[in-house]
Amino acid sequence: MENVTQKRTPGEWRELFSSQEFEEAYEYGGDDLGAVYQTQGTDFALWAPTAERAELLLYRAGSAEEGAAEPFDRTEAVRTEKGVFRVHKNGDLSGVYYTWLVTANGQKQETADPYAKAAGVNGQRSMVIDLKKAEPEGWDKDQEKLPKAPAPVVWEVHVGDFSHDPQSGVSEENRGKYKAFSEKDTCLDGNTENPTCMSWLKWLGVTHVQILPMYDYGSVDETGKKLQYNWGYDPMNYFVPEGSYATDPYHGEVRVRECREMIQALHRAGIRVIMDVVYNHMYRYENVLNNTVP
């Protein structure tokens, strides 16, 4: 088909993306996008069919504020089938942060990976993660199916709201965090007749908890320098847990492990988990999807 990397107007992009020809040429159904980690090396793959070029940048930390303003490694990606750019890097990269420098529509944009599973503080940079190391104890047994609920009772929960109050009975360091769901026998002001948090959910008898967005969203500063609140309908990284709910937002594996612990705690209580996700918009115009494929 025609050259899809040339500069276009928004209307021309819309026409191109809507065409059957583009879909047939570039639709990609593989499951290897993002950073596929192994101890001996990591494969990076980015779907960006309209990009002229893509470069992989590796960093020692998740943000410039942590002393890693410049990448320690840059690698030109190879354009392969269906507009997928690929890089293979040897060695154990677990815990290394990365971005893509994408040249598309006449502009260069440094962006996080739309397919990343972990990220540094505020989602600025993606992180290579060994998902096995981020498993809480017993996670491998969490795949067992729960009994079917005859009459579903769904309770909506905001991770921060769930335990933020000082009278919640949750330890101070875990209030408003994923780990609050793992605390047992919590009650109001020490009065066991007034259960809170997980004890309250079990007392209610709910069968499902629908969690307001717990993917990485942009309207709350994860550093915690100031008190902020949002429902979370401002997505930045769809496959990365929100860092403000983690006890450590700077190291990407922590949010993954603690989010899993939350889900595990709910399952152990016999409660299914529903994720609330919004796909019709993102936090800002300069987002990981638009920076990758304008």
Predicted regions and their residues:
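Substrate-binding/active-site clefts of carbohydrate-active enzymes
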Residues: G160-P294
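Beta-strand signatures of extracellular beta-sandwich domains
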Residues: E55-L57, T99
